[in-house]
Amino acid sequence: MRIGDLKAVNDRYQMFSVFTSEQETDAKFIFSAKDNLTSKDFETKAGSRILEGYRPPFDATPIAKLREAGGFLSGKTNMDEFGFGTFSANSAFGIPRNPFDLERSCGGSSGGSACAAAVFDDHVSLGVSTGGSIVCPASFCGVYGLAPSYGRVSRYGLIDYGNSLDKVGLLSFKASDLRKFLPIISGKDVHDPTSMVQPNLALGKNKLKSVAIPKQAMEGEGISKGVMECFDSSLETLKGMGVDVEYVDMPTLKYSIPAYYVIATSEASTNLARYCGMRYGHQDGDYTLKFDDYFTSFRSQYFGDEAKRRILLGTFTRMVGYADRYYNKALQVREAIIADYKKQFERFDAVVTPTMPFISPRFDEISKMSALDSYKADFLTVPPNITGMPHLSVPCGYSEGMPVGLLFTSDHWDEDVLIDTAERWDKAFTVKHAEVSL
């Protein structure tokens, strides 16, 4: 389906929080962007009521670069509030619907971006990953999702969740779009001190020859039978491509979820302190209150439940007397996980697992999940994110008619291996397009 009547499309799939009423004319390509990337001609709300009405005066660097390359921004995509979620069900402005089954989630938190990539032809979408927010929805929606190395793409203009974790990346139905668009959005940016001087992408020069499968990731509870069948079939496809496959020990992976949520919530609680009803978005609180009372009242009214939960968790882990016990120890665990991956990359080109342990859940199933159930669902996507390493999800099969993803993680700055892998995979595996209708 091509972009035409965006309202009719969005009424059905709810992928956009806001979209253009203009028609593209001379644009070289059409793209969308997750709604936590600022854009000067659209509201930027990051899925939160507290930012409703906020119109930034500038474009985020990745959006600016795509526009400079001739791109037309079609809209801002729905997401979990500030990126806090696995299913894009924590949005104040619409929950995106999976194009394979409207009663199921698109994944999160870049669910709207994955939905747009799956529904529209010749469309690329910018996503943002903190703990799996690009590859999870890519898996659930049957598209390609690439999260680059931390520092590869500028974060200037990104509404932060976790400063040391956030990465801007790409989602598209076409594997070739990764090769086309990653060089455009990459590069050192004077506006972002976390962006790095980086080696050039050696696209086409480095190929996937060997992969490691961590035993600890595969032995854990929660991977469904259907996903395992697709994964086993994918390993045979890799072998047919001439790739060596070997199971390895990566004992630190079991600590990735607790370490990640300590780091992520700690950073989120500081980042969200600026939203107090005085500078951004809503500014209609009760000004007769004292500051602390105003601050508490306003944030209680406009933050969603998951945002409040993560603010409280992060505030606790940073308190005097607790920071060494939790936050600083989590940073040490992150270094141990990085070392575990580096050890594997001495012998292998990538580490491979399923992207998600199950197919996209139905919304009635999500409503019955506890917060802990939701957090635990990220156990395959968190490890590459906490390390800042580039990772890629490719569609690898279907279970109960829903897409299943295969996750490749490579060493820092080795996106060229992943992009080549995506293009080779695209030739070896027939990716199904969702049957889109209005």
Task: List PLM regions with ranges.
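Short, well-ordered alpha-helical
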Residues: 1-60, 80-85, 194-197, 202-204, ...
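Residue-level signal for inorganic ion chemistry
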Residues: 6, 16, 178, 211, ...
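A short helix-breaking turn/cap at a secondary-structure junction
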Residues: 15-18, 147-234, 297, 431-437
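Phosphate-coordination loops involved in phosphoryl transfer and adenosine-cofactor binding
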Residues: 28, 76, 208
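Short, well-ordered beta-strand elements within core beta-sheets of diverse protein domains
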Residues: 50-54, 166-173, 315-319, 408-409
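Short connector loops at secondary-structure junctions
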Residues: 240, 244-260, 396
